[in-house]
């Protein structure tokens, strides 16, 4: 029996593969999407227990858009979102929109140790979804 279901939305294939391998070795079912629209489609097909979401993908604020879509969807808004980014110190740092709220339950700077990813996934997978609203 799987510990829970994790969706990773990130355009970095190496990061996705590393996170997927680490989480699967701990008993999680893991799906990956390399762009926001695909991640939303996958969420609507089968709701995950937690989403790890990159902020900067094809567009500098694609992850912000995805988090807004999740927050505005009654079927998805209870899914915990963990935002991942390497924006600190990047060329995008000065262009990031600070006037829009980030709809995230946790915010992590890359690189994130894989053991921390596992701990976070374990925490959210064993909590009732209603406790995140």
Report residues per predicted region.
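Helix N-cap/capping motif at the beta->alpha junctions
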Residues: 32-41, 62-63
